């Protein structure tokens, strides 16, 4: 069982357009409405591949009710913690060439009592859990050390923890000793306050996070693939996608596949890459079913080329 926590979930509307032209009326060629949020997407990806998961999330207002309905319609085991504020809505605009424009609301402010209730819900959900994946941005009212404090309690209880966040929250969480953190290139660069122009620089930055407390660092690099830096060394890989549709949720699918495969070494990285590639081939933030995951598309690199330049933000 993998428990996920999404502190700032959303309703995600994805709209496909032929071309985004500011200041004009644009006709959509396709629109979808999906549950959103990093942890939510991890649970959805796990469910689609028949891996047991439970999603803990705060919800409020009509949008929150709709979010829970959508998740339960997909079969997700939801632990909904009611809050006074309304769940946010996000919009993604996708163009045929793969260009993505996102409009994300900040989300509701959480009170101290609401945050305590969420924490207790996570702890109560971990009875048979192998992992807790704490994912996404922190909503207003939540201090940067929240994931670190939660991670500390979970690690003390013998539960493995994955953290996917950014900025000060990522740096604080690393100090609490999570099993794995999953930044993308931009988030990793922000964490070390330096540009990452090559694979080698990304590896060095990941080692910095390991030196601060993270056991493993899984870095999503977009079209450049992904990178795993751990006690066993460095392994990298990528997966070809013939017809990309949307990158929304690809990093979440990467983490889900990695955790589902045991979160250890090159085999887990390969599984994560296969899940991520399958997600990119789907519209909006749809997560791939088991029969949509093509592992033959994955290529792991026996020797990571540290001088290879990075072209994608991840």
Question: Which sequence ranges carry the predicted segments?
Answer:
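Glycine-rich phosphate/adenosyl-contacting loop at the front of the ribokinase-like
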Residues: 1-56, 65-66, 241-244, 306-314
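Hydrophobic anchor at the start of a short beta-strand
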Residues: 2, 52-54, 78, 161, ...
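Conserved N-terminal subdomain of the carbohydrate kinase-like
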Residues: 18, 47-129, 297-314
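Conserved phosphate/ATP/ADP-binding segment of small-molecule kinases
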Residues: 145-161, 165-232
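Short, small-residue-enriched loops and turns at beta-alpha junctions
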Residues: 108-111, 138-142, 169-172, 190, ...
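Short acidic, glycine-rich surface-loop motifs adjacent to enzyme active sites
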Residues: 126-139
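Conserved phosphate-binding/catalytic region of the ribokinase-like
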Residues: 200-314
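Short beta-strand scaffold segments in enzyme catalytic cores
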Residues: 44, 89-93, 225-229
